[in-house]
């Protein structure tokens, strides 16, 4: 027993010595200071993490502002022996493109438009040209003088331009040429020209995609489906080989982009009668994703809905709003300030007429288009008729809604007002 107790004492002594040695080493280690807590201070508790709200999307970059203004050029020719008798009206619209921050691309486009003007005026392109038209008009008038026949004496050639899309990616123009040289009705045709807004290059169908065969097949199939399922194209059932007739529309000059999508169209008489006119097929942009290159699709838009307000220019203090352009619809009219409140897209200004049979306005002339306006204004010179308004401003809001408004005058106090085109009805 004594031996056992002795052994226990030996082990205990050894453990004590080891512990002392360990304590000496621990004492040499510097420990961080403990936090001091006041007696009255409650310990801080870590709050439960709150769900952070989804970050608001950044507004989409607006890109370079694109403005297209249209100037009309008109020549009037009268009979050589009767200044009161008009025998020819020869006119054409000239679009002028301005791209903020990219004068080089705008110059390329404007040079091509100048070439189109020259071809139309001289008659070396499609159309007779002013000299050929005047010669025909003089021959027609001479026949009338010699025979006294009851014939139409006024010939005409008119080329108008519709701005179907203008943004930082694409500038798309549709030229409509109408000629009348006697007979029951005149003749007309459309021609589409689409430009790359970054370079000014005139686009062709094969430049829309890296896989033209797949693109071509998709477009033909889409048109064929529309023709079979949409009642708008019911008359096309009479065409014997409809697939071949539709595939022929995949050609240069017979397509353009507008706010809705890719449009392909026929010539008059090609698919239907003169009364039915030009047949158009629209393929929405949503259907063109992964079919054409993404850069040709419209940019995604974000932000609140914008709107317009109008006032007399004389009532607007100088320097109170940024004026980006001046648009003259009628040089003898009032000078107005048309201001965008917030951001609006695809702004266009056009002359219109009201059709009683459809209870809608249809465009008679394009004046101006702009890719976007944000808290800025234009000076607008226009007449305001006493009756039905004849000038329409169209624009798209951030959510994609297309709006059409008219400028009119209040019957109560004579102030300049904006009215919704959808709310207008003819009286009487």
Set out the residue ranges of the language-model regions:
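Positively charged n-region of N-terminal signal peptides that target proteins for export
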Residues: 1-11, 21
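Short, surface-exposed binding/anchoring microloops in extracellular/periplasmic proteins
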Residues: 308-357
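Short, solvent-exposed, Trp/other aromatic-anchored flexible loops in extracytoplasmic proteins
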Residues: 363-406
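Extracellular beta-sheet/turn segments enriched in Thr/Pro/Gly and aliphatic residues
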Residues: 311-315, 321-326, 404-428
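Extracellular mucin-like PTS domains
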Residues: 35-57
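Compositionally biased intrinsically disordered regions enriched in Thr/Gly
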Residues: 21-35, 54-313
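The feature marks short-to-medium sequence segments in extracytoplasmic or secretory-pathway proteins
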Residues: 201-234, 339-374
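C-terminal motif of bacterial Sec signal peptides marking the signal peptidase cleavage site
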Residues: 16-19
